[in-house]
């Protein structure tokens, strides 16, 4: 089993007065672009870590049996606190997991599947996406 931790707890401080995750991008909430890609991918479970405005974000999320919602009440402590909350849901059944940000609307299920396959082949390495020689997210472990 490979799980994905989708980080969705931040305060969106760079966009004042709005939560960017619920803001519309190409006709749907920003978070639902990456979520749709995760749902369509081979990933077995999607652990969504909510925090800031968790009720508003939860209301607009796509639905799937793959999704597990958790709430980071300490989201103001930063991204590492959300990663820790997500990691608590990774079990021994997992051969690997990936961490992705929820504000990445251009990530497709094919990108996620590349990390998924790579994790199954060599799960003792860190797996990253690369574009034009730049390393980025999502990251697999």
Regions found by a protein language model. Name each.
Residues 20-21, 27-39:
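Short, well-formed alpha-helical segments that are part of the catalytic scaffolds
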Residues 15, 57-61, 115:
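Hydrophobic packing residues within well-ordered alpha-helices of enzyme cores
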């Amino acid at each position: 089993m490979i799980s994905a931790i989708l980080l969705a707890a931040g305060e969106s401080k760079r966009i004042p007065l709005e939560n960017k995750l619920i803001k519309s991008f190409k006709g749907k909430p920003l978070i639902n672009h990456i979520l749709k890609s995760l749902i369509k991918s081979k990933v077995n479970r999607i652990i969504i870590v909510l925090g800031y405005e968790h009720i508003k974000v939860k209301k607009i999320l796509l639905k799937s049996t793959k999704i597990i919602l958790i709430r980071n009440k300490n989201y103001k402590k930063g991204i590492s606190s959300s990663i820790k909350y997500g990691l608590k849901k990774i079990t021994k059944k997992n051969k690997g997991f990936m961490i992705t940000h929820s504000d990445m609307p251009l990530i497709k299920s094919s990108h996620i599947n590349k990390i998924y396959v790579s994790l199954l082949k060599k799960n003792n390495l860190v797996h990253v996406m690369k574009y034009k020689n730049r390393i980025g997210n999502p990251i697999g472990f």
